[in-house]
Amino acid sequence: SNGAKADPKTVGQIMQFRVVLPLNGTDTTANPALGAALRPTPMVKLTTGGVPPASFDQKRQLTLNEVMGMPQGIYPGGPLEILVNNSKWMAAVSETPRVGATEVWEIINLTADAHPIHLHLTQFQLINRQSFNLNKYLKAYAAAFPGGGLDPMTGLPYPAGVYMPAYGPPLAYNTANADGALGGNPAIGPFLQGPIRLPEPNENGWKDTVNMYPGQVSRIAVRFAPTDLAAGSTTAGTNNYSFDP
């Protein structure tokens, strides 16, 4: 990477394979020159054109938060930890979808960085992304915190209307906000800016990880059912897996 000549004893070597034996049968692997589809059965699509599924069981709005440290002496403050919905991993379980359900999750990235988000035990599809007014939303978000507790940085109680790291969401998780979303956060709708941004070609289809960019809402369609079932064919409460999740 620094432009130095490759060492011929290590990375400067190339391995070459020469296949000279004739085939024992018909080659059934894909031939790109023929232009045929690699997947004979089209992939199930929960979303097309940046539009959420025609029907879904629940919407959630969850935040990505960076907890910052205070400057001490000559050392500048910086990120101490990254939290999902302002909650530590040892916090109580908050996302409890029903098996078979289809949900729309809107991930609100309040940090300065892109974060790859991975969901366990299920795949999902990226719907779209959209920018929002970060400064105005942060003010509304901070204003929703009740105060109390103890700020470990200052040793004093948090005043009301100030962001409380690792407190969890500022509002009741299971009470829908003005956007009709669970998660315990102020609705992001009034702060959205500009048009939606469609997924890149490589982001289409089923994914287990997608990048969530700063200052944007990333919307994903999550279905808690096998990926080969047709869109709209699953029902919340019905287990279509071959095991008990």
Where would I find each of the regions flagged by the language model?
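Extended terminal and domain-junction accessory segments
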Residues: 1-191, 196-203, 213, 223-229, ...
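Short strand-edge motifs at loop-to-beta-strand transitions and within beta-strands
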Residues: 206-210, 216-220
